[in-house]
Amino acid sequence: DDLVFFFVGIVILYLFVLAVASHFKRIVYPKAEKKYHCAILVPEESPLPVIYREESYEFFTYNDLHQGINTLDREHYQLVLILSNTAISLSPLFLEKIYNAYDAGIQAIQLHTVIENRKGFCNRFRAICKEIKNSLFRAGNTQFGLSSNLSGTNMAIDLGWLQNNLRSSKTNIERKLFQKNVYIDYLPDAIVYCQSSPVHPYRRRLRKTASYFFPSLLEGNWNFCNRIVQHLIPSPLKMCIFVSV
């Protein structure tokens, strides 16, 4: 019992440090010196989200993500933005903030997902859990120079990198980025408003995820090690139930 509570205490301390760090001042990227073009991908039969008037973007719908990305011309588009099927609108100056980060050398960006529908206990609880994860595992991580977690949707990634590394629609983009040690930033001011909580596109395979820990540790890939640890931490609901018991 003492050992269990010791590990629980370590986890709580770890999460507390991330929570405090998430409120520190963030880096503001300077205005992009170049003009970029962005391809915005949304699933077929999904409504196109409302976007404030901005230049240099085009909407595309896709049924197969791998096929959709590989049909894009990398000579014309530098960035690809993958949105969830529940996205309804984007915040003002949305693309400008993404372009500023990309111009500074950031190849992968997790955007801030905000759930609009909060009617009822379940929807409100999902929205709260989403914001907790945003604060801890995205904003908190980046304050320590570690990569943000990637949700699999509502993200912006360098098109050339995606076309070179996305082998199929089942490829786990987040895992591939961590394995290649590509830094993932989080932009809390680039907001994607969603009608409901987006579905995570990857299966949660704890055993397979844990198997990457020691190889990543030996390689000194601290970003991936940190992500694996966070992947193994129970959800906020399970943590609350365990602590209350």
State the predicted function of each range.
Residues 1, 5, 24-32, 144-145, ...:
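Basic/Trp-rich segment in TM-proximal cytosolic loops or flexible interdomain/linker regions
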Residues 75, 98-166, 203, 207:
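Long helical/loop segments within the catalytic core of UDP-sugar-dependent glycosyltransferases
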Residues 77-89:
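Short beta-strand-to-loop acidic/aromatic patch adjacent to the donor-nucleotide binding site
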Residues 68-79:
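Active-site nucleotide-sugar/metal-binding loop of Leloir-type enzymes
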Residues 108, 116, 156, 168, ...:
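Conserved active-site beta-strand element of glycosyltransferases/polysaccharide synthases
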